[in-house]
A protein has these predicted regions:
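Radical SAM/AdoMet-radical enzyme domain recognition
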Residues: 137-153, 162-288
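Conserved alpha-helical substructure of the radical SAM core
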Residues: 32-47, 51-53, 61-63, 68-184, ...
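Short glycine-enriched, charge-decorated loop/helix-capping segments at active-site entrances
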Residues: 122-130, 221-232, 300
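Flexible glycine/acidic-rich beta-alpha junction loops that bind and position SAM and/or redox cofactors
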Residues: 217-223, 261, 281-309, 322-342
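Short recognition patches in nucleic-acid-associated and regulatory proteins
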Residues: 15, 20-31
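Short, flexible, mixed-charge glycine/proline-rich loop motifs
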Residues: 3-11, 29-33, 109
Length: 342
């Protein structure tokens, strides 16, 4: 095989994925791929693709070293931890944290009514008891002191398995937060008539609805099989959930977990579906599969899909709507965490 040119772009710090030791690391360009490389004295060297600059079908993703957006640090108003051991061990948030909270994620349960093969929260199975209403109130009060008026996403697990979810939503609304959103797989929203309206009346604004593909073939490898009543399939229930939310006045954002070779060829079709389901559906959020929570052991070898891959796939699949210049680094989080578009 021909040798691949190697270029060290810059140095940074990272963690050993096994023991979480802080390590010196470097971003390296190898051919058309950008890798984050680090070596743990105990567990060896790790290298992971984080960006692809390849040209394919006249679609060229942005160069890695040009993908940045300078930001002025915005520190938390009330840090929760002191600086003792350095990043990330003091995080909680500490006084050195250079970004205030834009959206606070509050986990209200680790229970779930699905058992997805890929789950960022590793939810379901043997899980601890739900946090009490008093604990949730304490978390919301802490979040309000650190970043008053920020948006809040109630997450899990599956938040709708809690029968007191409307009370939790009211609790958050009473504390003056901005947008209130629930992260959901949509089962209860689609199957229980009137449930979406209950959440709306409690003060909910939006539902962050899991939806990986416009067809079952692209969903089942990520979600597994689900026992549903009346001969319904998973996508039929999700469509009902969108209808119920729209009728109740709740906005919906479709959220897709994308894995290479599973549903990466369906992103354009998913965008077309999101537009078709508007104005109830107001956005599409695409999350590349990640190596945390619950994931298959072969993830490193084949399923990884980078941000640049997402941008390139969208431009190839819906060229009439999207071009590479439509994508920009985010305004809140680190440039390598996400992108935004029109």
């Amino acid at each position: 095989m021909p040798e691949v040119d190697v270029e060290i772009l810059h140095e940074t710090q990272s963690l050993c994925p096994v023991c979480l030791r802080r390590l010196d690391a470097r971003y390296v360009r190898r051919g058309q791929s950008i890798l984050l490389e680090r070596t743990c004295p105990e567990h060896g060297t790790f290298a992971v693709d984080i960006w692809h600059e390849r040209t394919e079908e006249d679609v060229t993703p942005p160069r890695f070293d040009g993908w940045s957006r300078p930001k002025t640090p915005s520190y938390p108003r009330e840090p929760r931890t002191a600086v003792r051991h350095g990043c990330p061990y003091d995080c909680g948030l500490c006084p050195a944290h250079a970004q205030h909270t834009c959206t606070g994620l509050v986990e209200v349960t680790l229970r779930c009514n699905m058992a997805c093969p890929i789950c960022y929260a590793a939810a379901g199975g043997a899980v601890p008891d739900d946090p009490s209403p008093e604990t949730v109130a304490f978390q919301l009060d802490s979040l309000r002191r650190a970043s008053p008026g920020c948006n809040v996403q109630l997450s899990g697990g599956e938040p709708t398995v809690r029968d007191d979810l409307p009370a939790i939503i009211r609790m958050a609304r009473e504390r003056g937060f901005g947008l209130l959103q629930v992260n959901s797989n949509g089962l209860r929203l689609g199957l229980e008539a009137g449930y979406a309206r209950k959440l709306r009346e409690a003060g909910l604004d939006s539902v962050y609805l899991q939806w990986d593909s416009p067809d079952l073939e692209g969903c089942l490898p990520l979600r597994g099989t689900v026992a549903l009543p009346d001969g319904l399939d998973l996508l039929a229930v999700k469509r009902r959930a969108v209808e119920q939310c729209t009728a109740a006045g709740l906005g919906v954002v479709l959220v897709a977990t994308v894995a290479r070779g599973v549903n990466d060829d369906r992103l354009g079709a998913l965008l077309r579906l999101a537009l078709k389901l508007g104005p109830g559906v107001r956005g599409l959020h695409i999350q590349p599969v990640a190596r945390f929570g619950r994931y298959p052991g072969r993830l490193e070898d084949g399923l990884r899909f980078t941000l640049s891959d997402v941008m390139a796939a969208l431009c190839r699949q819906v060229p009439q709507w999207l071009r590479m210049e439509h994508f920009h680094p985010p305004g809140c989080e680190h440039s390598l965490c996400s992108f935004s578009s029109l």
